[in-house]
UniProtKB/Swiss-Prot annotation:
Belongs to the bacterial ribosomal protein bS6 family. InterPro entries: Ribosomal_bS6, Ribosomal_bS6_sf, Ribosomal_S6_plastid/chlpt, Transl_elong_EF1B/ribsomal_bS6. GO terms for molecular function: small ribosomal subunit rRNA binding; structural constituent of ribosome. It comes from Streptococcus mutans serotype c (strain ATCC 700610 / UA159). This is Small ribosomal subunit protein bS6. Coiled coil: none annotated. HAMAP family: Ribosomal_bS6. It comes from the Bacteria. Keywords: Ribonucleoprotein, Ribosomal protein, RNA-binding, rRNA-binding. It holds the Pfam family Ribosomal_S6. PANTHER family: MITOCHONDRIAL 28S RIBOSOMAL PROTEIN S6, SMALL RIBOSOMAL SUBUNIT PROTEIN BS6M. Binds together with bS18 to 16S ribosomal RNA. The keyword rRNA-binding applies.
Length: 96
């Protein structure tokens, strides 16, 4: 299985309840498409290097995941691009 790390930045003015629902929904996107989540954790609210959609800071969330194919990652990528609560995301393949 290939190992990946997903980092995404959530808009800072989101309510705690909505943030938890967003994280649960995107974790479910991965698991429903065949990926195994090793770890899913919040980092912290951090200042951004430059403004993104008029925000100067964002809530960082990191997911470590294992998957056989890229279907789950492609679906995560597609949905995170159209979600207004996610400012940016990045998927990186980890060394085995």
């Amino acid at each position: 299985m290939a190992k990946y790390e997903i980092l995404y930045i959530i808009r800072p003015n989101i309510e705690e309840e909505a943030k938890n629902a967003l994280v649960a929904r995107f974790d479910a996107v991965l698991t429903d498409n065949g990926a195994t989540i090793v770890e899913s954790k919040d980092w912290e609210k951090r200042r951004l290097a430059y403004e993104i959609q008029d925000f100067r800071e964002g809530l960082y969330h990191v997911i470590n995941v294992e998957t056989e194919d890229a279907h789950a990652l492609n679906e995560f990528d597609r949905l995170s691009k159209i979600n207004n609560d996610i400012l940016r995301h990045m998927i990186v393949k980890l060394d085995a």
